[in-house]
Swiss-Prot record:
A motif (Nuclear export signal) lies at residues 1072-1113. It catalyses: N(6)-acetyl-L-lysyl-[histone] + H2O = L-lysyl-[histone] + acetate. Residues 1-22, 39-63, 187-272, 472-494, 526-611, 1088-1113 are annotated as: Disordered. This is Histone deacetylase 5. Its main location: nucleus. There is a cross-link at residue 35 (Glycyl lysine isopeptide (Lys-Gly) (interchain with G-Cter in SUMO2)). The gene is Hdac5. The active site is at residue 824.
Length: 1113
């Protein structure tokens, strides 16, 4: 019925109407304009012969023509229906877009509301915190005001008190002591003798006793003031002169003593009191009495039994030593008394009464041998200027890492005999032993750290002379010059002077103790074999640290006798000899200082200079043997023979007692097996809170591993290597000088370093207060100011020693049981339990000192070794491969993306197998073995390293929770990974313990790795593991790694297709591939043989042709 024109018109409308359904949903505007457009698609059944629906124009044109009304009505209804459907569709689209925009705006509004609420909460919290702080400050101010008012009221009450009231109320114990003492003294008859009347007469009890323990009266006055100085008259007298005793007997009159003390302080014109007969000795010049004789005349100057006379700093040369002999103080100028009042040697010593001047530091000397050291007190000078100067010096000492001395050393006491440093030649050895006994008892009571004073420094007490031979070993008593040589010495107000004196005595005590320890070790060490290589000495190592190492060594040696030829016994003797060298070097330094001044005694210098010169020459020759060639047994300092412990019987050693370097060269011998290094010194790095449960990285980690190796018998198959502390120069191969001094020094050795270099690190050292009460670099990296620096240096040194022996061919491989870990430590940053990067430092030193060409570092700790990657990111000679949990940067430390492949010339030498996908499912044995099969081993074999270092962190072993692990690798798997790495670098593999905090897990993994290193047969993997396929997340990770690394290592490309295979399928495929290659090789060899036979048949061989010239089969 429709005309062709109508059909054409409909077809022409179809493209314009067909645009609407293809419009994207998001491109429809919010306000849609609905136009009355008729649909362009009509049912095919509505048309006539044309098969199309007429357009509105055609319909309007068709109205003029004749048409069936029913059909026309039906057509209009269809068009209206289609139009309604189109409009309904447009409404739905409009509503959908509206709903989408509404949801979007709703979410934005919710986010804005949450952000606003969060800001309001933060503001409220800050306001609350500020209010609490203000309230606390107001409370503190109120408390201070109340305290101030209370003190003012007390002061007002004291000022307005009546004279009849008591100044102080003595305790019941003091009252009883005084009463018993007075009763006992009142019953005793007063002797009239001159020689020994002082200790028995009640008038002189104050000068004979010096504490409440000896029934002395209570000390009045505020703390810190000098003790009262009694005025004993040293001759017979009557009861009219007994005024002080009667006054001090009654309690209300105790304040009289303070008045007497004030009078004594004001009357400073003369150190000698007037005698009753009017005889006066030079009241205008303060001069000391010179003692020109010895023997009884000297000991009788103080008019008392030996050890009981009074003394003062101005006349301390007359101090009676503990055994009655005269001690000398080289810091007090000594002059003759005026000529009109010279003191004859045979005169009665009770003519003079001496007292101490309160203007100087007062030390009570001349104690009896039975009196404890607490009876001698060091008091501060009441002068304000002297006190300020001492405070300034103490603060400066603290800034430099020293300790407080003098009046700042808490409330402890210093023996009075410490000032008597220079003993005369005829002094009894018993006096010297008792002097050491006093020093030992004094140092044992110190709550603070040991006094750290440079032993090589010049003593401030001896400015006119250099350090005497008191620095010798204890074999000889020190000799000093007479008192006439010390006229230019300063007064002893300086705390550094007392420090130097104490340190000299401590040094002598240390040497004596060391000789005894060496003699005890002699019986064990004489049965050992050759000496091992001697580690490098460290000038900054202190005697305290060496003593601790020796004590630990004695504890081990007493339990087990080392087998013959073991490195444990060799290194023991080696350490003792190293300490001897350090002591003699210190003595040598002191002697050279004296020679520069030209005042050394003629009988002291030559023998010491001769012995030290010979000893120095011996080690100068030995140091020429230090350069080592790679993979050859090194010539160490141990090749220089020593007369082992025999030298310690006499000190200093004479040149004749030492053998020449060429007499009996000793060859270093090691069992060619696995080396293990461990040192108990690393156990001292721990938090000051002492609670290991809140600190995952604690000393029990390496203790447990060491015990496991002993229990299983693996340790007996290994060669134990003696560790050492790494030097600061070695640490600076990777870390900055600032970082090295910051964490590589402690108050024990900081004094021997340059103070200018230490000024920055020490002043800017910042610590964080941990919730446990200790301190740390951050919230988890704890720090111990006394021991952490030595422990972290010991960890580095142990690994360096072990790696050097493996690289030089002395050992087959090695396992370092060290802590704290190091692979997180960057050039100037400590983090993640790490301070110094042990593995990176070892790799650098192997290249610098042993000329190792290429080093492979494999890090299978679950955390990425950001410090190691940073150290070698641009170095093509070190290949770093890390397998770690990455999770797209959401796992600590957040670095180690697969795209990090190196920089500059080191592009391609940094490989990160960064596991992603979390712990659902956790990465296990299959994934690690697949990574080794497809990525690690192919790249490592193509790199062909000379030495392999492994950062063996075991926190991927099952048993570690998600924050510190979360994976389920078995300990057995790490043994198989170690066995694969042993096929590289000729087996020169060294494992260093890194992370791992579950004790059972790390012990099992360490046992498996050491078993693999010892070539012990490992337990086979479970069949389920061999049949299991890697997880989807692991396959995706390995595919990405291969895609990135195939640009630099073509060997990994062929493994991309088999990543989803199980280990059993991969082994089968590799076996078939190997058989195919072998068959092809056999076919080619057979063809060559046939060709060679045919050639031989056609050209006979001459008879004289040698066999070597036959064609190779």
């Amino acid at each position: 019925m429709n005309s062709p024109n109508e059909s054409d018109g409909m077809s022409g409308r179809e493209p314009s109407l067909g645009i609407l359904p293809r419009t994207p949903l998001h491109s429809i505007p919010v306000a849609v304009e609905v136009k009355p457009v008729l649909p362009g698609a009509m049912p095919s059944s509505m048309g006539g012969g044309g098969g199309g629906s007429p357009s509105p124009v055609e319909l309007r044109g068709a109205l003029a023509g004749p048409m069936d009304p029913a059909l026309r009505e039906q057509q209009l209804q269809q068009e209206l229906l289609v139009l309604k459907q189109q409009q309904q569709l447009q409404k739905q689209l409009l509503f959908a877009e509206f709903q989408k925009q509404h949801d979007h705006l709703t979410r934005q509004h919710e986010v804005q509301l949450q952000k606003h609420l969060k800001q309001q909460q933060e503001m409220l919290a800050a306001k609350r915190q500020q209010e609490l702080e203000q309230q606390r400050q107001r409370e503190q101010q109120r408390q201070e005001e109340l305290e101030k008012q209370r003190l003012e009221q007390q002061l007002l009450i004291l000022r307005n008190k009546e004279k009849s009231k008591e100044s102080a109320i003595a305790s019941t114990e003091v009252k009883l002591r005084l009463q018993e003492f007075l009763l006992s003294k009142s019953k005793e008859p007063t002797p009239g003798g001159l020689n020994h009347s002082l200790p028995q007469h009640p008038k002189c009890w104050g000068a004979h006793h010096a504490s409440l323990d000896q029934s002395s009266p209570p000390q009045s006055g505020p703390p810190g003031t000098p003790p009262s100085y009694k005025l004993p008259l040293l001759g017979p007298y009557d009861s009219r002169d007994d005024f002080p005793l009667r006054k001090t007997a009654s309690e209300p009159n105790l304040k009289v003593r303070s008045r007497l003390k004030q009078k004594v302080a004001e009357r400073r014109s003369s150190p000698l009191l007037r005698r009753k007969d009017g005889t006066v000795i030079s009241t205008f010049k303060k001069r000391a009495v010179e003692i020109t004789g010895t023997g009884p005349g000297v000991s009788s100057v103080c008019n008392s039994a030996p050890g009981s006379g009074p003394s003062s700093p101005n006349s301390s040369h007359s101090t009676i030593a503990e055994n009655g002999f005269t001690g000398s103080v080289p810091n007090i100028p000594t002059e003759m008394i005026p000529q009109h009042r010279a003191l004859p040697l045979d005169s009665s010593p009770n003519q003079f009464s001496l007292y101490t001047s309160p203007s100087l530091p007062n030390i009570s000397l001349g104690l009896q041998a039975t009196v404890t050291v607490t009876n001698s007190h060091l008091t501060a000078s009441p002068k304000l200027s002297t006190q300020q100067e001492a405070e300034r010096q103490a603060l400066q000492s603290l800034r430099q890492g020293g300790t407080l001395t003098g009046k700042f050393m808490s409330t402890s006491s210093i023996p009075g005999c410490l000032l008597g440093v220079a003993l005369e030649g005829d002094t009894s050895p018993h006096g010297h032993a008792s002097l050491l006994q006093h020093v030992c008892s004094w140092t044992g009571r110190q709550q603070s750290t040991l006094i750290a004073v440079p032993l090589h420094g010049q003593s401030p007490l001896v400015t006119g002379e250099r350090v005497a031979t008191s620095m010798r070993t204890v074999g000889k008593l020190p000799r000093h010059r007479p008192l006439s040589r010390t006229q230019s010495s300063p007064l002893p107000q300086s705390p550094q002077a007392l420090q130097q004196l104490v340190m000299q005595q401590q040094h002598q005590q240390f040497l004596e103790k060391q000789k005894q320890q060496q003699m005890q070790l002699g019986k064990i060490l004489t049965k050992t074999g050759e000496l091992s290589r001697q580690p490098t000495t460290h000038p900054e190592e202190t005697e305290e640290e060496l003593t601790e190492q020796q004590e630990a060594l004695l504890g081990e040696g007493a339990l087990t006798i080392p087998r013959e030829g073991s490195t444990e016994s060799e290194s023991t003797q080696e350490d003792l000899e190293e300490e001897e060298e350090e002591e003699e070097e210190e003595e040598e330094d002191c002697i050279q200082v004296k020679d520069e001044d030209g005042e050394s005694g003629p009988d002291e210098g030559p023998d010491l200079e001769e012995s030290s010169a010979g000893y120095k020459k011996l080690f100068a020759d030995a140091q020429q043997l230090q350069p080592l060639q790679v993979y050859q047994a090194p010539l160490s300092l141990a090749t220089v023979p020593h007369q082992a412990l025999g030298r310690t019987q006499s000190s200093p050693a004479a040149p004749g007692s030492m053998k020449s370097p060429t007499d009996q060269p000793t060859v270093v011998k090691h069992l060619f097996t696995t080396g293990v290094v461990y040192d108990t010194f690393m156990l001292k790095h721990q938090c000051m809170c002492g609670n290991t449960h809140v600190h995952p990285e604690h000393a029990g980690r390496i203790q447990s591993i060491w015990s496991r190796l002993q229990e299983t018998g693996l340790l007996g198959k290994c060669e134990r290597i003696r560790g050492r502390k790494a030097t600061l120069d070695e640490i600076q191969t990777v870390h900055s000088e600032y970082h090295t001094l910051l964490y590589g020094t402690s108050p024990l050795n900081r004094q021997k370093l340059d103070s200018k270099k230490l000024l920055g690190p020490i002043s800017q050292k910042m610590y964080a207060m941990l919730p446990c009460g200790g301190i740390g670099v951050d919230s988890d990296t704890v720090w111990n100011e006394m021991h952490s620096s030595s422990a972290v240096r010991m960890a580095v040194g142990c690994l360096v020693e072990l790696a050097f022996k493996v690289a030089a061919g002395e050992l087959k491989n090695g396992f370092a049981i060290i802590r704290p870990p190091g692979h997180h430590a960057e050039e100037s940053t400590a983090m993640g339990f790490c301070f110094f990067n042990s593995v990176a430092i070892t790799a650098k030193l192997l290249q610098q000192k042993l000329s190792v060409g290429k080093v492979l570092i494999v890090d299978w700790d679950i955390h990425h070794g950001n410090g190691t990657q940073q150290a070698f990111y641009n170095d093509p000679s070190v290949l770093y491969i890390s397998l770690h949990r990455y999770d797209n940067g959401n796992f600590f430390p957040g670095s180690g993306a697969p795209e990090e492949v190196g920089g500059g010339p080191g592009v391609g030498y940094n490989v990160n197998v960064a596991w992603t996908g979390g712990v659902d499912p956790p990465i296990g044995d299959v994934e690690y073995l697949t990574a080794f099969r497809t990525v690690v081993m192919p790249i490592a074999q193509e790199f062909s390293p000379d030495v392999v270092l492994v950062s063996a962190g075991f926190d991927a072993v099952e048993g570690h929770l998600s924050p510190l692990g979360g994976y389920s690798v078995t300990a057995r798997c790490f043994g198989h990974l170690t066995r694969q790495l042993m096929t590289l670098a000729g087996g020169r593999v060294v494992l260093a313990l890194e992370g791992g905090h579950d004790l059972t897990a790390i012990c099992d993994a360490s046992e498996a790795c050491v078993s693999a290193l010892l070539s012990v047969e490992l337990q086979p993997l479970d069949e389920a593991v061999l049949q299991q396929k890697p997880s989807v997340n692991a396959v995706a990770t390995l595919e990405k790694v291969i895609e990135i690394q195939s640009k630099h290592w073509s060997c990994v490309q062929r493994f991309a297709a088999g990543l989803g295979c199980s280990l059993r399928e991969a082994q089968t495929g590799e076996k078939e591939e190997a058989e195919t290659v072998s068959a092809m090789a056999l076919l080619s060899v057979g063809a060559e043989q046939a060709q060679a036979v045919a050639t031989q048949e056609h050209s006979p061989r001459p008879a004289e042709e040698p066999m070597e010239q036959e064609p190779a089969l």
